[in-house]
Amino acid sequence: MFEIAKKYMPGGVNSPVRAFKSVEMEPIFVKSAKKSKLIDINNKEYIDYIQSWGALILGHAHEEVVEEIKKQAELGTSYGLCHELEVEMARLIVKHIPSVEMVRMVNSGTEAVMSAIRLARAYTNRELIVKFEGCYHGHSDGLLVKAGSGALTFGTPSSKGVTEKIVSNTLVARYNDIESVKELFDKYGENIACVIVEPVAGNMGVVLPKQGFLEGLREITKEYGSLLIFDEVITGFRVSINGAQGYYNVFPDITTLGKIIGGGLPVGAYGGRKEIMELISPQGPVYQAGTLSGNPLTLAAGIKTIKIIENDPDFYSKLDELGKYFEEGIVSALGDFDVKINRIKSMLSFFFSKQEVDSYEKVINSDVEIYKKLFKCLFENGILLPPSPFESLFISSSHTKEDIEKTVYYFEKFSKKLKEGKV
């Protein structure tokens, strides 16, 4: 199938990481997926820790979500006009994401970030933006500068086709290094429109913010009249129902969302303070539009997902317990090796490294060759990790202790083979 795919699609895929190139393998083609498992076209079953790159916090094909999609499909798949689900989704986002007073729906995280930055520039009447090494904010030109995720593996610090003129307005600081931010503001502060950051980096693997880092960003941006943008495409409704901002109690001016709020369908959103959001067309001068923005199928799935979370007061604590169980199992299995695990709730990464991994530099200096061997070993035994050492693992509410135990068993088998020099 891959050979056929390569005839019609660049590299045979629609997103680079799916090619499995980083682990020196060919991709699988999925036939179906349910709960924590997926089945490929050869009828091989896998326990899936990709979960659509974090979009499926309830797992694949959750019965209630699927039913909502079916019901909405009977009523129409797209209107290109206003409908009640848009209002309900906006209400839920404003209810749960502390810094958001108004929100605009779009179709992807990339689109949300593009729009948020345009809005920040309009609000501040400034041009420069600050991003961080290893943080990925989609594939828009101005942000493909030392980007994380797929660009860590396949790109150079700036992708071909991105001109120097476009990226000349993008300043790059070091994640978890507040002094590097202060240096940029000392030099360019009066011209910086915004700082955009993943509050928990999730696209160079999971890298948690050091104590005081997010607070420092909030303080500096306020001092200079710049806006702080949290890219919560991954962390929104993942680390808590209030996102990372609620978890860390640091509140940005603008938030971008995606993944979970679409219930597994294409989605994006950006929101913030009312005075900022009212600059968006048709109320204000900042133009942004989309034929499929606020798509009813997507919003039906997303609303149902959020309501399922709302109705279970123990939802996140149960996910955290599973995440902790998985983390402890990996530590036990790989205890004879230099491995560092970064986890927050139901997203985690492990790095083969002698030092704590809290920066882009330490991420890229970890041993990716061991990860490739681990990926292949687990893959052969029906365990699907992300096909890149620079991506996060995601646990859904459909994963079970039995799933975790089976996975840890094969971690142990790999550890034994590695010690014996058999991989």
Swiss-Prot record:
Pfam families the UniProt entry points to: Aminotran_3
Predominant location category: cytoplasm
Record pathway: Porphyrin-containing compound metabolism; protoporphyrin-IX biosynthesis; 5-aminolevulinate from L-glutamyl-tRNA(Glu): step 2/2
Listed PROSITE patterns: AA_TRANSFER_CLASS_3
Compartment(s): Cytoplasm
Top EC class for this record: isomerase
Single GO MF annotation: transaminase activity
Keywords, sorted A to Z: Cytoplasm, Isomerase, Porphyrin biosynthesis, Pyridoxal phosphate
Highest taxon, organism lineage: Bacteria
Gene Ontology annotations for the cellular component aspect, listed alphabetically: cytoplasm
Keyword check for Transmembrane helix: no
Cofactor: pyridoxal 5'-phosphate
CDD domains the UniProt entry points to: OAT_like
Record's keyword annotation contains Isomerase: yes
Residue numbers of N6-(pyridoxal phosphate)lysine PTMs: 259
Cross-referenced PANTHER family: GLUTAMATE-1-SEMIALDEHYDE 2,1-AMINOMUTASE (PTHR43713), GLUTAMATE-1-SEMIALDEHYDE 2,1-AMINOMUTASE 1, CHLOROPLASTIC-RELATED (PTHR43713:SF3)
Protein name: Glutamate-1-semialdehyde 2,1-aminomutase
